[in-house]
Amino acid sequence: MRFTVWFLSGVALLGAAEWPQFRGAESNPISADTRLPDKWSATENVEWSTAVPGRGWSSPIVSKGRIFLTTVVTDGESKKPQTGTEYSNQYVAELQKQGLDEKEIMARVMARDFELPHEVNLRYFLYCLDLATGAVRWKREFHSGHPPGGRHRKNSFTSETPVTDGSAIYVYTGNVGLHAFDFDGKQLWRTPVEANPIYLEFGTAASPVLHGDRIFIVSDNQERQYAAAFDKRTGKQVWRANRDIGETTGSRMRSAWTTPYIWKNKVRTELVTVGPKTAISYDLEGKELWRLNGVAASPIPSPFATGGLLYLNGGRGKPLFAIRPGATGDITLGEGARSNVSIAWTERRSGVYLPTPVAYEGALYVLGETGIFSRIDAATGKLTYRARLDDNAGSFTVSPWAYNGRIFCLNEDGRTFVVAAGEEFQLLRTNDLDDFSMASPAIAGDRLLVRTESTLYSFRTRSAPK
């Protein structure tokens, strides 16, 4: 761990330093704290950096001066990630040119780009770090052994982000289970969940969400899709809603990786989920409220709401939807329609494969996995501009975040593109870390927490030396 001495000209507001779940409390990663840094590198504006053993793409969460994150340590070698989204497809094309049959091609792709359960023995850890220093307060091993399913080499075995209510940390790992710990690291309970196959052994990623006394999860897999609620005090299942969505013929793509969203709107509070080809919203007892067909077969971006509308990214080649509160039944758009009584607008070319958009200062900023960046009016759906961040922007998995009139886009190589908020595209600068990056950052008061493959960084605007 590296630690830099800082001069603090005041006390940070403790309440502003809470980041309780994936993408923050409102599932829209923005901040009004003007002290947050615009520039950083592995040496610039680094308050501290702490090496994190193993690998995990879960985001850090923050509560009461503590940071929590998960990781998996592998006995022996593990397949390292590789940037980009098309390299497996390119490999398939190369093998097809060699005249290999489909079975042999699939065997070679699985051997090169996937890690299967029998190939690895894992130890799953929850880490607690001190927010001010980065020092490890404690770590707890909560599971071990061969994983219940495989992963694509770009995924991790702990891609789900924990959630906290300020009293306990709730850790969900897809196909493994739920675990609860207090802030001193004492395990409160554990609840195993059934293991179901994921499409082509891609692995899992959908994080849990919390509302009141319940933890909500979604498991869209190849065999038994479901959404479920658990009592946060005991870990006991409260309800389960089985789902049957996605393709039933051909590729049978029935898996998804989206994190659900608790939408507290003027009509009611509901659990919004996005699965293969279909989005479904439930009330908090598991009763279906509405559904929308027309999303991608393998969705990854997560829904969120701001300004009275729910924003739902349909995925690559699909629309971006803005949904009004109070929807009921099937709200699918008719052929050629862009809106209806429940859907305020759609932007047909703005669905993307991986990153979730961010809403900031009246606009949605949409980042595609290849670096195409768009601004859309959040109220009307009007496209303001669409631009390429840079001719050599690289590939993007991390969702953008925003503060201080800037939008931040972190690519998989660790380079952040800083774009001015507003109606005209303006790239202000880039910040380089030179480390593989796929975890969405956390914002804690005046600190930006960025997790790379090897390290957790706390970036903070440097003050005058003491």
Residue ranges with predicted function:
Residues L8-A16:
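Hydrophobic h-region of N-terminal signal peptides that target proteins for export
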